């Protein structure tokens, strides 16, 4: 279980905690659409408009709730699972609301500069679980016969029209889910940084994946490359300034932190033609009671995710075990 920090996008279905649950209607999206119309948004064609409202008034999905407490670090973000629809921060007069950022984080919107979440401050997060009807009906089959492009534009328009916090969070969650289901987005799509891959890394990637056909085979081969016994995890190691590159890591030092392993994996995977992204986050931390998690800096980690057709964004672990 991971709280995604910097991935764009990040797979949402891996959060399936058996915590306190409650029902919340997906008509929240329909309500957000009505608010969008009230603010001057463009009305959809009548048949689509009616289907949209009827559909989401009738579909419900279980919402899970978790209570989270960062125990030894301050933060300007409220760490949260993907598909978060609501957060509640207790006892903070300087926090007026919360907003999703373009990285899927929950960020405090404050009335003072540099406000941050202090250690041991607890907050709650409500988020959707994975529901097949919601996922396939909304994404794979399309919404009310709208094209993917039209629906994407609608979500963007709704976000940009100045929705209330509740509607904004709802629409942003749907936009994130939409983005997750499309693995062939152009390189110019917002949020995807493109990196030059050296010929040295391309040659190594080709040798690792030679003779392999399927994406999952290539991803597993690249993961196995780091687990051949020659790499070591060393939290205190620092490469020479003039050699702090992925090429030096895989070919010479073979020592580093999770960031080094994840970065090298991503470059090798991208060179092999895989759809991959680098993720930093925090695992679920120490469970205090049912639904309550304490998260410390020791729970931080970096890892890659590869999009595997039929399975979605899949976590791989190139980082080898270490003494730290």
Residue ranges and their predicted role:
Residues 1-324:
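Helix-boundary/low-complexity linker signature
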């Amino acid at each position: 279980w991971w709280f995604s920090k910097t991935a764009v996008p990040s797979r949402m279905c891996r959060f399936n905690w058996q915590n306190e649950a409650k029902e919340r209607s997906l008509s929240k999206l329909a309500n957000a659409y009505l608010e969008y119309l009230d603010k001057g948004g463009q009305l959809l064609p009548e048949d689509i408009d009616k289907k949209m409202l009827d559909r989401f008034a009738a579909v419900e999905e279980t919402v899970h709730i978790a209570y989270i407490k960062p125990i030894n670090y301050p933060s300007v973000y409220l760490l949260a699972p993907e598909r978060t629809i609501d957060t509640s921060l207790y006892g903070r007069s300087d926090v007026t609301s919360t907003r999703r950022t373009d990285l899927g984080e929950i960020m405090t919107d404050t009335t003072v500069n540099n406000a941050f979440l202090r250690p041991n401050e607890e907050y709650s997060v409500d988020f959707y679980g994975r529901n097949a009807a919601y996922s396939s009906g909304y994404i794979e089959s399309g919404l009310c016969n709208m094209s993917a492009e039209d629906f994407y534009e609608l979500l963007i328009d709704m976000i940009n029209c100045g929705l209330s916090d509740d509607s904004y969070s709802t629409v942003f969650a749907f936009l994130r889910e939409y983005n997750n289901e499309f693995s062939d987005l152009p390189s110019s799509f917002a949020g995807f940084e493109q990196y030059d891959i050296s010929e040295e890394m391309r040659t190594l990637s080709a040798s690792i994946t030679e003779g392999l056909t399927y994406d999952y085979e290539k991803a597993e081969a690249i993961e196995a490359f780091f687990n051949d016994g020659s790499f070591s995890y060393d939290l205190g190691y620092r490469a020479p300034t003039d050699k702090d590159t992925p090429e030096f890591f895989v070919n010479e030092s073979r020592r580093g932190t999770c960031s080094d392993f994840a970065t090298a994996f991503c470059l090798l995977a991208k060179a092999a033609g895989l759809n991959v992204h680098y993720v930093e986050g925090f695992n679920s931390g120490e469970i205090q009671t049912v639904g309550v998690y304490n998260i410390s800096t020791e729970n931080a980690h970096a890892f890659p995710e590869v999009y595997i057709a039929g399975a979605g964004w899949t976590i791989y672990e190139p980082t080898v075990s270490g003494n730290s």
